[in-house]
Amino acid sequence: MKDQVKQIHFVGIGGVGMAGIAEVCLNLGFTVSGSDLKENPTVRHLISLGALIQFNHDASHVKNSDVVVVSTAIAKDNPEVCFAKESRIPVIPRAAMLAELMRMRFGIAIAGTHGKTTTTSLASAILTEGGLDPTFVIGGKLNQFDSNARLGSSQYLIAEADESDASFLHLSPMMSVVTNIDEDHMETYQGDYANLEQTFIEFIHRLPFYGVAIVCIDDQNIQNMLPKLSRKIRTYGFSESADIRATEVLHQGLSMHFNVKANDLPEFSVVLNQPGKHNVLNALAAITVALELDVSIESIQKALAGFGGVGRRFEVYPSRSIGHKNVTLVDDYGHHPTELEATLSTARMAFPEKRLVLVFQPHRYSRTRDLFDEFVQALQHADLLVLLDVYPAGEAPIAAFDSKALLQAMRLRGHKENLHVESQQQLNELTETLLLDDDVVLVMGAGDVGQLARDWKQQAY
């Protein structure tokens, strides 16, 4: 590729998925340029590596580019995209560039509605500890590397595979992982679960006949899909029918202890430096990948015990002063009812006897509409709920399915400990009266609520 392509331009380079691919391209020796509307830590990191980044969208930015990479968030009438098409500069989706990087390596693609970022991070950490030195591209910052991407020296490339727009069908990996299948991003699938399932089947069939698919047997939707697959399958889970399963699972503070049983290996123990039974499943997926590649049990144990976590995935910041109250802050990206329930359940186990205050920003009106009853059910597990306005992500408001509607539905079901705030500034003004010493404050959502968590962990007031 380097003989034909010298400069790669990324439109919307500040997005975590785009930035990871851009970083790998920089490290491969390509000239990387890009544009975005605002600066953020990810963009500053890329600039420090040599990327040429502009903070507006203008046709002049792409004049010297050999290819333009876009994410699904970029409008078709973007001036850079329009100029590139008029100039016959190839315009390709982010996943197509990832596929090109994967084509040159042994690709490991990790998909699923929930848990794929953590699973990709765990697999990357284990393979690195095992001496395989993989390249990885992740949808979140792997804390021990302080980055969401890294160019390794080996043939292995581990990547998070995105089903939200079905773009994972661009990939042709040697090994695929599916953590679970749940209804989300249903606008991509015409609101029909059968279309979603068929797309996951096609994703697995992107494997060569000698490839392997690793799937969670505990997930009912995956169980239903298995008879439709015609590739080698390895299963993991808590179920006795799993090829690789966890037993003797014990929650201790912010870590999980369990044993791993595999059909062809002696049982071994694991300490995972992450809380929650859902993270045991994520770890099992990563362990299965590692065992397929002959990584030693000792390397698996060491990597999981020392795992530094992922940005905004149950990131815990103890002893923070918020509103002059001493609290524990937990920052999490979860924005689907299943993720809310898993995170709140994990917090209950990690912080027994403490009051859980959930600050939640719903993400997209369409998701709130499609999963309205599920959100109402999941949000009731908090002791105190603070709902921010829905983060629209470019969607037009739907009044019947906004935060006020969620709040009203919860109160009709008897959950009175909740309130709606219209802005993060208003929330900051209310913290002194809302919070108590020793509270656990969970900040959750996929929108700009992450900035609130960053502000709270960086400054006491």
Swiss-Prot record:
EC number: 6.3.2.8
Highest taxon in the source lineage: Bacteria
Molecular functions (GO terms): ATP binding; UDP-N-acetylmuramate-L-alanine ligase activity
Keywords, alphabetical: ATP-binding, Cell cycle, Cell division, Cell shape, Cell wall biogenesis/degradation, Cytoplasm, Ligase, Nucleotide-binding, Peptidoglycan synthesis
Main location: cytoplasm
Catalyzed chemical reaction(s): UDP-N-acetyl-alpha-D-muramate + L-alanine + ATP = UDP-N-acetyl-alpha-D-muramoyl-L-alanine + ADP + phosphate + H(+)
Alphabetized InterPro entries for the sequence: Mur-like_cat_sf, Mur_ligase_C, Mur_ligase_C_dom_sf, Mur_ligase_cen, Mur_ligase_N, MurCDEF_pg_biosynth, UDP-N-AcMur_Ala_ligase_MurC
SUPFAM superfamilies to which the protein is assigned, alphabetical: MurCD N-terminal domain, MurD-like peptide ligases, catalytic domain, MurD-like peptide ligases, peptide-binding domain
GO CC terms: cytoplasm
Sites where the protein binds ATP: G112, T113, H114, G115, K116, T117, T118
Pathway the protein contributes to: Cell wall biogenesis; peptidoglycan biosynthesis
Localization in the cell: Cytoplasm
GO BP terms: cell division; cell wall organization; peptidoglycan biosynthetic process; regulation of cell shape
HAMAP family, alphabetized: MurC
Biological role stated in the UniProt entry: Cell wall formation.
Family membership: Belongs to the MurCDEF family.
Name of the protein described by the UniProt record: UDP-N-acetylmuramate--L-alanine ligase
Protein species of origin: Hydrogenovibrio crunogenus (strain DSM 25203 / XCL-2) (Thiomicrospira crunogena)
Name of encoding gene: murC
